[in-house]
């Protein structure tokens, strides 16, 4: 990640533009989640987005609301469960502007079932003006 201020500014512009797929290359999951939470809070305060539209997934917490840290339902801890939750969330009542942060994603560098599922999720996010943010670390 570049310096935090530049990264936060770029992330804010991407979220305002509703870019459907954002990749953050980082090994610092906690710092990146804090930055996303800070940027998201700014966007909520400025009226761009709703605080009920930001979710994150970690292996230890499962899916949770990024602002309240409250677990969301019985989603399980796997990234595939988080992806299924996101699909349901985007389809539910045609909710727009939902954001899901996936901190652990399977290898999507090749053509396989996992990469196809992520592609389908991103396509749906694009249709519903949602955003999927994934953390990537190739080391």
Model-derived features: where do they sit?
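ATP/nucleotide-binding catalytic cores
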Residues: 1-139
